[in-house]
Amino acid sequence: MIVDFHTHIFPKKMRENREFYFHSESAFKLLYNSQKAKLAGSKELVKAMDEQGVDKSVIFGFPWKTTETFKRHNDYIMDAVQKYHGRLIGLCCFDPFNSDAVSETERCIDGGLLGIGEFAFYESGIN
């Protein structure tokens, strides 16, 4: 069995308008400012998995700073896991310093995600 264990996917709105998030999310801009940095959705991911013989992918979003954005993205991950049940394994993502981190973890676990996908410290000085 082949499992891709670190896969970010993004909702259509984020893929089509990544620049909208650059002002408030500097870590996102740092990683995705270039148009060469591909943003894929769940449909594109599963198609690529089929083409490459990947059985399962562990998916998550991005550790957004803003609560509204990470909730929207985690909702997308939960929806993708339901849509491609058995193929996609979902983890939640958020800024670990956000005051809603604990409640978001609980919400995502209750929604079928299996844990936390990434604690990103891109700009914190922690390495």
Protein language model regions, located:
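An N-terminally biased module of ancient metal coordination in phosphate/nucleic-acid-related enzymes
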Residues: 1-60, 68, 109
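Active-site gating/metal-coordination segments in enzymes
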Residues: 55-56, 64-127
